[in-house]
């Protein structure tokens, strides 16, 4: 027999059973050993681009056209038509303003700027005549200037309203004379009386010019005859003197 030492004999090692990491039979996902593990990167999504102002304007124009087309399909009253036209004009003005100022937000941006803008100041009150310096005379030359300015304006009213002007002149003169004293009123009356006499002479002269030419010629002939006889008498007196 051969010796046991002559052959190498290896004793098989007993397999050690694997000890489960968990005592439960359910399988679980392995926990990451480190919290610093890198997260998977996400693919970049598509970038959003801001629509150009012209695109918003085209959309607004298309909207207006659709509204106008829809309004044509049904009858509308005058008030609705005016409101629609006014709104269309307003939208058109807003679009023109947007193109002019180059707003990035199109019509909406222009509208927002218009709302944010301060309200315009109220119009100034109209000037009164009493605010003019000419109606505040202080010296005699100032009153003369006022008279020369107002008189032509007021007297021209007689040309357009000859029936109403006399009453106006009387009441206006009375209103102007109200602050005057008695002596000043007498002077005013005397001035008016003198002016009245002047007017009477002018009217008589005007009536005399309207007489018939035949009567005027006959009157002139009579005067000529009278002058001739007088001349003869004077001539006889001259003979007596000689």
Swiss-Prot record:
Signal peptide: none annotated. InterPro entries: eIF3-like_dom_sf, eIF3j. It comes from the Eukaryota. Residues 11-21 have a biased composition (Low complexity). Gene3D superfamilies: Eukaryotic translation initiation factor 3 like domains. Residues 1-10, 23-38 have a biased composition (Acidic residues). It holds the Pfam family eIF3_subunit. Residues 71-89 have a biased composition (Basic and acidic residues). Residues 1-58, 71-97, 201-242 are annotated as: Disordered. One of its GO terms (cellular component) is eukaryotic translation initiation factor 3 complex. One of its GO terms (molecular function) is translation initiation factor activity. GO terms for biological process: formation of cytoplasmic translation initiation complex. Keywords: Cytoplasm, Initiation factor, Protein biosynthesis. Component of the eukaryotic translation initiation factor 3 (eIF-3) complex, which is involved in protein synthesis of a specialized repertoire of mRNAs and, together with other initiation factors, stimulates binding of mRNA and methionyl-tRNAi to the 40S ribosome. The eIF-3 complex specifically targets and initiates translation of a subset of mRNAs involved in cell proliferation. Component of the eukaryotic translation initiation factor 3 (eIF-3) complex. Belongs to the eIF-3 subunit J family. This is Eukaryotic translation initiation factor 3 subunit J. It comes from Yarrowia lipolytica (strain CLIB 122 / E 150).
């Amino acid at each position: 027999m051969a010796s046991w030492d002559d052959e190498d004999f290896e004793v098989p090692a007993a397999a050690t059973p694997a000890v489960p990491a968990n005592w439960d039979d359910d399988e679980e996902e392995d926990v990451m050993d480190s919290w610093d593990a890198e997260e998977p990167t996400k693919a970049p999504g598509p970038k959003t681009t801001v629509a150009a102002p012209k695109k918003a304007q085209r959309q607004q124009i298309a909207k207006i056209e659709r509204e106008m087309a829809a309004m044509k399909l049904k009858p509308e009253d005058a008030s609705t038509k005016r409101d629609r036209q006014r709104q269309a004009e307003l939208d058109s003005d807003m679009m023109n303003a947007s193109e002019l100022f180059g707003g990035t937000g199109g019509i909406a941006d222009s509208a927002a700027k218009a709302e944010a803008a301060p309200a315009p100041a109220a119009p100034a009150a109209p000037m009164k005549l009493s605010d003019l310096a000419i109606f505040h005379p202080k010296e005699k030359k100032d009153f003369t200037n006022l008279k020369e300015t107002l008189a032509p304006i007021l007297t021209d009213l007689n040309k357009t309203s000859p029936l109403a002007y006399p009453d106006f002149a009387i009441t206006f003169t009375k209103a102007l004379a109200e602050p005057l004293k008695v002596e000043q009123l007498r002077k005013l009356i005397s001035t008016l009386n003198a002016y009245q006499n002047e007017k009477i002479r002018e009217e008589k002269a005007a009536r005399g010019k309207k007489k018939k030419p035949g009567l005027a010629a006959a009157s002139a002939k009579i005067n000529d005859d009278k002058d001739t006889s007088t001349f003869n008498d004077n001539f006889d007196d001259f003979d007596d003197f000689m």
